[in-house]
């Protein structure tokens, strides 16, 4: 396929048009008075959002050169989202400002490589200063503030803070769509996995359709159990103890299942069978987790263990087990604290090494089940469109909160970037390098300017006053007042601000050093001739 090539100024100008189209669509969402953007969906209702990365990913431009520019800035948003989970609009605004200012200077004859050096130098100083002014996050109230600012909703802030308090730093917080109108928090304490009872005849509470076992023994195996002869020795020992039994196996079927059900119905003893969670190697790991949590052993032929020679000493214990049609929850397992801690440390080590996002998510889930718990925020709304928008906002708030716990917080509303202004301005540089530093200085004003403009105010006036205010004092665009940002609860996670600045600078530097752009030539549609008449037909 034939290619079209553009060089130097012409290439950069074409890409800049794409950058501006994307950034202008994204930046209207910035700040407490930012607007929403409506995205068309081929199927179903349109998506209304103020999430920068969601908007950026949707934008495809017709001109291939403009599209390349737009895609570069979309990458800034995407990368910031991957690292910090929020701050994508800020990153886009910073990137647009750096590219725009940089291009003016390159057009005027500045050397792009010198400018790049200056940008990198300035960003390094700004990042160091951001880390220096960062404050660690303390207490439930601080967490609630970070979440409330990100989601623009105080109720959501309180929900996330409560969820984090209840599941701890190793816990997992997930989002689900609720059937109702309200957003609620549901916390599952203990080890829960997505497998229910094998037979509904095993239930003990017919109103709730669940089996509740108090102080049960827990048999854990990766085998398929079909013969009752294999289970008999261990069953007899459990019956003598007068305790119920939970069997976690690959499957329980045939004669074994029938015997368990008949004994349950006759009231001889209570046993509930559930299938083992997960698949393949993950199943083995999860069974081992359950064994460590309950103080039992996994009965597997890989270790030369057979079911029929199992004794009661190999079984796990728990204070309570609740089994529903779809879930099994083990509460208060009897495993030794040091064994559980060793397993947690092992999973943490795997988490640090893994490169797969999927594996990371699964390891995090396992860690939560062993260490903290799992909190589910059920998002409710009146319409499907509102539900999607609300879910995206809460997801951002959740990510922002995690980032804040990790690296601390700085003043929000673009104030933190303005607080590092003097440090960046003091950098000693000459020539094109000094120009690069000035480009960063102009760019770090941009978020404040944009937040003010979205609130219907003159951005330049706010920026100039901010330069004279003492550090930490900023402009609250929601109320129009000048306040101590951290005291007023207007905060941003340091990680979010830092990632936005670093990613914007990285893409801007690449953009300015571009000298040629190659794109596919659009194919001309040659109209195919119509079919000839078929004589005599009506």
From Swiss-Prot:
Which CDD domains does the record cross-reference, listed alphabetically?
GroEL (cd03344)
Q: Which InterPro entries match?
A: Chaperonin_Cpn60_CS (IPR018370), Cpn60/GroEL (IPR001844), Cpn60/GroEL/TCP-1 (IPR002423), GroEL-like_apical_dom_sf (IPR027409), GROEL-like_equatorial_sf (IPR027413), TCP-1-like_intermed_sf (IPR027410)
Any Pfam family hit: Cpn60_TCP1
* Positions with a binding annotation for ATP: 29-32, 86-90, 413, 476-478, 492
The keyword Lyase appears for this protein: no
- According to its UniProt record, which reaction does this protein catalyse? ATP + H2O + a folded polypeptide = ADP + phosphate + an unfolded polypeptide
Keywords from the UniProt entry: ATP-binding, Chaperone, Cytoplasm, Isomerase, Nucleotide-binding
Annotated localization: Cytoplasm
One cellular component GO annotation, for this chain's record?
Answer: cytoplasm
- Disulfide linkage: none
Query: Is-annotated flag, keyword Chaperone?
Result: yes
> Which GO terms of type biological process are on file?
protein refolding
Query: Its family?
Result: Belongs to the chaperonin (HSP60) family.
How is the quaternary structure described?
Answer: Forms a cylinder of 14 subunits composed of two heptameric rings stacked back-to-back. Interacts with the co-chaperonin GroES.
Put simply, this protein is called: Chaperonin GroEL
């Amino acid at each position: 396929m034939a290619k079209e090539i553009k060089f130097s100024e012409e290439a950069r100008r074409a890409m800049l048009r794409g950058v501006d189209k994307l950034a202008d669509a994204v930046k209207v969402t910035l700040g407490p008075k930012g607007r929403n953007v409506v995205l068309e969906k081929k199927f179903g209702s349109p998506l209304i959002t103020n999430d920068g990365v969601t908007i950026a990913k949707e934008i495809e431009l017709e001109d291939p050169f403009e599209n390349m520019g737009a895609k570069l800035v979309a990458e800034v948003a995407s990368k910031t989202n991957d690292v910090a989970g929020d701050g994508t609009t800020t990153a886009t605004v910073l990137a647009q400002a750096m590219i725009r200012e940089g291009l003016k200077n390159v057009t005027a004859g500045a050397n792009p490589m010198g400018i790049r050096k200056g940008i990198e130098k300035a960003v390094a100083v700004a990042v160091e200063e951001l880390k220096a002014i960062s404050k660690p996050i303390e207490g439930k109230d601080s967490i609630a503030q970070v979440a409330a600012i990100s989601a623009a909703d105080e109720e959501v802030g309180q929900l996330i803070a409560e969820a984090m308090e209840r599941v701890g730093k190793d816990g997992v917080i997930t989002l689900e769509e609720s059937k109702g109108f309200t957003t609620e928090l549901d916390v599952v304490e203990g080890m829960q996995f997505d497998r229910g009872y094998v037979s509904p005849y095993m239930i003990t509470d017919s109103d709730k359709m669940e089996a509740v076992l108090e102080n049960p023994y827990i048999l854990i195996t990766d085998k398929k159990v079909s013969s009752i002869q294999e289970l008999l020795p261990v069953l007899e020992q459990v019956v003598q103890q007068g305790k119920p039994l939970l069997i976690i196996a690959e499957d329980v079927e045939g004669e074994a299942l029938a015997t368990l059900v008949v004994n349950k119905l006759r009231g001889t003893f209570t046993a509930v069978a559930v299938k083992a969670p997960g698949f393949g190697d993950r199943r083995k790991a999860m069974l081992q987790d359950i064994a460590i949590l309950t103080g039992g052993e996994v009965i597997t032929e890989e270790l030369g263990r057979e079911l029929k020679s199992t004794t009661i000493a190999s079984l796990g214990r728990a204070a309570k087990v609740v089994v529903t049609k779809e879930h099994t929850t083990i509460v208060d397992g009897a495993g030794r604290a040091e064994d559980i801690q060793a397993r947690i440390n092992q999973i943490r080590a795997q988490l640090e090494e893994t490169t797969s996002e999927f594996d990371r998510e699964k390891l995090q889930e396992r860690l939560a089940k062993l260490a903290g718990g799992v909190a589910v925020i059920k998002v409710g709304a009146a319409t499907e469109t509102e539900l999607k928008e609300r879910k995206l906002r809460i997801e951002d708030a959740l990510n922002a909160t995690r980032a804040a716990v990790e690296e601390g917080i700085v003043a929000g509303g673009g104030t933190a970037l303005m607080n590092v202004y003097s440090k960046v301005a003091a950098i000693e540089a000459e020539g094109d390098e000094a120009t690069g530093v000035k480009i960063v200085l102009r760019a770090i004003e941009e978020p404040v300017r944009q937040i003010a403009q979205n609130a219907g105010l003159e951005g330049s006036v706010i920026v100039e006053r901010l330069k004279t205010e003492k550090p930490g004092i900023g402009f609250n665009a929601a109320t129009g007042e000048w306040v101590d940002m951290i005291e007023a609860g207007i905060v941003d996670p340091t990680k979010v601000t830092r990632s936005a600045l670093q990613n914007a600078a990285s893409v801007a530097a690449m953009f300015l050093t571009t000298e040629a752009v190659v794109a596919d030539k659009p194919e001309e549609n040659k109209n195919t001739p119509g079919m000839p008449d078929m004589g005599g037909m009506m």
